[in-house]
Amino acid sequence: MPELPEVETVRRGLTPAMEGVVIARADVNRPDLRWPFPADMAARLTGKRVERLRRRSKYILMDLDSGETLLVHLGMSGRMLVSGDPLGQFVHSHPAPEKHDHVVFHMANNARITFNDPRRFGAMDLMETASADTHKLLSVLGPEPLGNDFHESHLIEAFKNRNSPVKSVLLDQRIVSGLGNIYVCEALFRAKIHPIRKAGKISGARVATLVPIIREVLAEAIEAGGSSLRDFKQADGELGYFQHSFDVYGREGAPCKGEGCTGQIKRIVQSGRSSFYCAQCQR
């Protein structure tokens, strides 16, 4: 499932084609994805100007001039692909429609944005922009890891007296939003913290080091266009490249990249997810 860097990469790719542009027509080709689409979604999108594209956690939020916001979740295999984006006086051709093109935005600038989702775990919903923060999917989210509300004292307080493994705590979207399996594994390696270590047993000083490390990992991943492991593509159809920089994720049995370390990367399963780590480096 796309994590924060992948969703942010898609948002940045969509912005030039959508922000400030009218949706000339919206095609909704099925009644649902993971959940039913909101009533009259095509009509509520058609003719509306996209005032702003933003991201909250793993959701793309499209603020419209109608006072509504479209929430988009990519799910497991969802992609939002741009075609026909005007370049000077030329317009690139659009690809032929595909079977899993479920929602298509025809923009007034001749761009077309296609939401393609073979596994249909994605989702879309419409809400009032003024009350978007109270939406059931958004109201429970913790601070953004790249924002000012995510700081050392917040994380230290969240870890206090927690018997859960540190990895589980970092994956809790109520504590910090947008983190997923890949980037938690990578951050814990850089912090030299074992993924099964109980969060409440980690010193405040070590917990504090996680904040800049998490930000560093996410910033590097965004710069690389995210990680493409199975389904993820950027808005222009290109793959992400951060997977080539993984220190631990997906590297079971490979030599540890830690300086002077002779260990190998190991894999365990925690709450149904694979955790990758170096037993020599991470304590």
From Swiss-Prot:
<keyword id="KW-0234">DNA repair</keyword>
<dbReference type="GO" id="GO:0006284">
    <property type="term" value="P:base-excision repair"/>
</dbReference>
<comment type="subunit">
    <text>Monomer.</text>
</comment>
<dbReference type="InterPro" id="IPR012319">
    <property type="entry name" value="FPG_cat"/>
</dbReference>
<feature type="active site" description="Proton donor; for delta-elimination activity">
    <location>
        <position position="273"/>
    </location>
</feature>
<feature type="binding site">
    <location>
        <position position="119"/>
    </location>
    <ligand>
        <name>DNA</name>
    </ligand>
</feature>
<keyword id="KW-0863">Zinc-finger</keyword>
<protein>
    <recommendedName>
        <fullName>Formamidopyrimidine-DNA glycosylase</fullName>
        <ecNumber>3.2.2.23</ecNumber>
        <ecNumber>4.2.99.18</ecNumber>
    </recommendedName>
</protein>
<feature type="active site" description="Proton donor; for beta-elimination activity">
    <location>
        <position position="58"/>
    </location>
</feature>
<keyword id="KW-0479">Metal-binding</keyword>
<comment type="similarity">
    <text>Belongs to the FPG family.</text>
</comment>
<keyword id="KW-0456">Lyase</keyword>
<dbReference type="InterPro" id="IPR035937">
    <property type="entry name" value="MutM-like_N-ter"/>
</dbReference>
<feature type="active site" description="Schiff-base intermediate with DNA">
    <location>
        <position position="2"/>
    </location>
</feature>
<dbReference type="GO" id="GO:0034039">
    <property type="term" value="F:8-oxo-7,8-dihydroguanine DNA N-glycosylase activity"/>
</dbReference>
<dbReference type="Pfam" id="PF06831">
    <property type="entry name" value="H2TH"/>
</dbReference>
<keyword id="KW-0378">Hydrolase</keyword>
<dbReference type="Pfam" id="PF01149">
    <property type="entry name" value="Fapy_DNA_glyco"/>
</dbReference>
<keyword id="KW-0238">DNA-binding</keyword>
<keyword id="KW-0511">Multifunctional enzyme</keyword>
<feature type="active site" description="Proton donor">
    <location>
        <position position="3"/>
    </location>
</feature>
<feature type="binding site">
    <location>
        <position position="162"/>
    </location>
    <ligand>
        <name>DNA</name>
    </ligand>
</feature>
<dbReference type="GO" id="GO:0003684">
    <property type="term" value="F:damaged DNA binding"/>
</dbReference>
<dbReference type="GO" id="GO:0008270">
    <property type="term" value="F:zinc ion binding"/>
</dbReference>
<dbReference type="InterPro" id="IPR015886">
    <property type="entry name" value="DNA_glyclase/AP_lyase_DNA-bd"/>
</dbReference>
<dbReference type="InterPro" id="IPR000214">
    <property type="entry name" value="Znf_DNA_glyclase/AP_lyase"/>
</dbReference>
<dbReference type="InterPro" id="IPR020629">
    <property type="entry name" value="Formamido-pyr_DNA_Glyclase"/>
</dbReference>
<feature type="zinc finger region" description="FPG-type">
    <location>
        <begin position="247"/>
        <end position="283"/>
    </location>
</feature>
<keyword id="KW-0227">DNA damage</keyword>
<dbReference type="InterPro" id="IPR010979">
    <property type="entry name" value="Ribosomal_uS13-like_H2TH"/>
</dbReference>
<keyword id="KW-0862">Zinc</keyword>
<feature type="binding site">
    <location>
        <position position="100"/>
    </location>
    <ligand>
        <name>DNA</name>
    </ligand>
</feature>
<dbReference type="GO" id="GO:0140078">
    <property type="term" value="F:class I DNA-(apurinic or apyrimidinic site) endonuclease activity"/>
</dbReference>
<comment type="function">
    <text>Involved in base excision repair of DNA damaged by oxidation or by mutagenic agents. Acts as a DNA glycosylase that recognizes and removes damaged bases. Has a preference for oxidized purines, such as 7,8-dihydro-8-oxoguanine (8-oxoG). Has AP (apurinic/apyrimidinic) lyase activity and introduces nicks in the DNA strand. Cleaves the DNA backbone by beta-delta elimination to generate a single-strand break at the site of the removed base with both 3'- and 5'-phosphates.</text>
</comment>
<keyword id="KW-0326">Glycosidase</keyword>
